[in-house]
A protein has these predicted regions:
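Short beta-strand segments enriched in small/hydrophobic residues
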Residues: 2-17, 296-316
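Ordered, small/hydrophobic-rich secondary-structure cores
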Residues: 49-50, 66, 74, 79, ...
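Active-site catalytic loop in hydrolytic enzyme cores
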Residues: 65-67, 93-170, 175-185, 189, ...
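C-terminal beta-strand edge segments of enzyme domains
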Residues: 137-140, 203-303, 425, 491-576
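Cys-nucleophile CN-hydrolase/nitrilase-fold catalytic domain and related Cys-dependent amidase chemistry
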Residues: 20, 25-115, 177-196, 213, ...
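Generic beta-sheet signal
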Residues: 89, 174, 201-202, 380, ...
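Structural detector of well-ordered beta-strand residues that form the stable sheet scaffold
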Residues: 10, 87, 147, 199, ...
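Conserved beta-strand and immediately adjacent loop positions that scaffold enzyme active sites
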Residues: 8, 87, 102, 135, ...
Length: 576
């Protein structure tokens, strides 16, 4: 089925409490508002039938809806009446007291086209709901190819990634979230990294029974305002631009006119097809049972002093300058220094890899001589093995080259490169390091592999091509994997280097000692370098904090990934 050229999509934002009948009426009212705005598709929030708060399993089952019951029949009737596609998320009875959190799609004739169960549950949802046992196919409609997911599914990468790889043009995300970083990070990054549209509908108003707001706030030290839906429902373009956003605190419907076909061209500015260069054969660990592949126990330092060093000179002249700067910062205590991609090549471009090997070796020798006090330098340089030229993230110490991680994904910008065959890690006195050279960091699977392998720190010597890489992409690599990250690039129109570290207090609904709860779910501490030319940028990161990946009870950001539903990620998929 061919998508129409322009589609008006809408996200409806409203509150849903304990009264199923009132929530039902609210759904119908907001659908009517979307229809008044001439929407072709409207997405409603998660748990539109009842607040996600239950006395026990019996209560959870009682307030859930039947797929063929009156609640959803009325939604379908509204779809037919308004000639409108609708996505609504409800708790659904599955028999024998089993309940799922399910997104249901109706077409403009009122027919139910899909029912997609939530893959990643958070906190107490695990006590009452069954997570998805199968994936929901992409749905071909006259509007385009639609994929459905819900809230926590999008806080980590696997569910949206699988939908995009299966061909979705538009991802419909129903949320029930207090988290301020949904709108600022987790929603827009899924559009950009997959080059698809995202229509995300969140709630406003209390997420728990109003009578319990003050008692729960007192018991958990979570301010009452963060027990409400964070709103900011939004529609995001494939380049990560937020086209429209609702306010935080009131009912609203937001609209945008989009061309779903724009999501089908996956080429980056240099001509690289971001999906075609994927390496599913390398991603197998993502689809393996975490219980059968536990992260090895290890010790990591509480703190690590890091620095990004960028040259003012270009080409071969940058080697001496950078060596002097490395000597300075390592003598002053920097333990890990990361340099921009191909820092000693004009414009970050290698025109002749054979000559590039020679210049890279000169750089390695100079940097080794500059390393002080046991420090290491990560640089992006030309390496050679088995007849292959590589673009590698190299780790250099006082004794010279210690280790190299070849770039894993082909890039038109570095057409001379033969990609490597695995993501590996390097153990250092302060912890475990992974390096993503070239454009590897735009692929969420690469950082995921690093986290599964037990890395605490991720070094990224790179050159961005798209604004989202610095705005949300690298931040999400840190957030969804609970990794410290040091990203080095030449300052330019898209931004400059950044460093992320992790909060000590992290797990929601546990006692926090070092800071008050701020409404962020997994957003790391981000320090950005000045956008103007700055030779040295210093920061402190906390490797040991990467060991806690439990964002809420029974919800581990890495071990809790939907590994059993990852076939679209680990097998070559069509996205034509």
């Amino acid at each position: 089925m061919t998508a129409v050229k322009t589609v008006r999509v809408a996200a409806a934002q409203f509150a849903a409490g304990e009264d199923v009948a009132k929530n039902w009426a609210a759904c119908l009212r907001m659908i009517d508002r979307a229809a008044e705005g001439k929407a072709d598709l409207v997405v409603l929030p998660e748990f539109s039938n009842h607040a996600s708060w239950y006395q026990d399993q019996k209560h959870c089952y009682e307030v859930a809806v039947d797929l063929d019951g009156d609640f959803l029949a009325a939604i379908g009737e509204r779809a037919r009446r308004h000639h409108l596609h609708i996505v609504v998320n409800c708790t659904v009875r599955r028999g024998n007291d089993v309940v799922t959190a399910t997104s249901i799609l109706f077409d403009d004739q009122g027919q139910r086209l899909a029912a997609s169960d939530k893959q990643v549950l958070i906190g107490h949802e695990n006590d009452f709901l069954r997570k998805a046992e199968t994936t929901c196919p992409i749905v071909e409609t006259k509007l385009g190819r639609l994929g459905l997911y819900a809230c926590m599914d999008g806080v980590i990468c696997e569910t949206p990634r699988g939908l995009a790889l299966s061909g979705a043009d538009i991802l419909c995300n129903s949320l029930n979230s207090f988290a301020l970083d949904e709108a600022s990070l987790h929603v827009p990054v899924r559009a950009a990294e997959n080059h698809v549209f995202v229509v995300a509908a969140n709630k406003c108003g209390p997420l728990i029974p109003e009578a319990l707001l003050e008692p729960v706030s007192a018991a958990t030290s979570i301010p009452v305002k963060f027990l409400n839906g964070a709103g900011e429902s939004q529609i995001v373009a494939p380049d990560g631009r937020v086209l429209v956003m609702a306010p935080r605190e009131r009912e609203n419907v937001v609209f945008a006119d989009i061309d779903p076909r724009q999501a089908r061209d996956k080429r980056r500015p240099d001509g690289t097809d971001r999906f075609a260069v994927r390496r599913p054969e390398l991603y197998a660990p993502i689809g393996e049972d975490p219980g059968a592949r536990p992260i090895a126990e290890q010790r990591a330092a509480a703190t690590l002093e890091v620095a990004v060093v960028t040259p003012r000179s270009t080409g071969a002249a940058a080697v001496e300058e950078i060596a002097n700067l490395v000597a300075k910062v390592t003598a002053e205590g920097a333990e890990l220094v990361v340099l921009p991609e191909l820092f000693c090549f004009e414009g970050g471009v290698v025109t002749n890899p054979i000559d590039g090997l020679g210049r890279s070796q000169l750089a390695i020798d100079a940097l080794a001589a500059a390393c002080q006090r046991g420090a290491r330098v990560v640089a992006s340089l030309v390496t050679h093995d088995g007849g292959n030229h590589r673009l590698s993230g190299v780790v250099i110490g006082a004794e010279g080259l210690e280790w190299a991680q070849p770039m894993l994904h082909r890039s038109q910008r570095h057409a001379w490169v033969t990609p490597g065959d695995a993501l590996r890690t390097h153990d250092l006195p302060w912890g475990r390091l992974a390096v993503l050279p070239g454009a590897d960091a735009i692929q969420p699977e690469a950082a995921r592999l690093a986290a599964i392998a037990g890395a605490e720190v991720l070094a990224v010597p790179f050159a961005p091509l798209e604004a989202w890489e610095l705005a949300t992409g690298l931040v999400e690599r840190s957030a969804e994997n609970r990794l410290c990250l040091v990203a080095a690039t030449e300052p330019g129109r898209l931004g400059a280097s950044l460093v992320t570290t992790l909060e000590e207090d992290f797990t929601v609904m546990t006692p926090w000692k070092s800071r008050p709860f701020d409404g962020l779910l997994s957003f790391p501490i981000v320090k950005r370098a000045p956008s103007e030319t700055s030779s040295i940028f210093r920061a402190t990161v906390h490797p040991a904090r990467a060991h806690n990946k439990v964002v809420s009870r029974r919800t581990d950001l890495v071990a809790g990934r939907p590994w059993h539903l990852a076939a679209a990620i680990t097998k070559r998929a069509s996205h034509a």
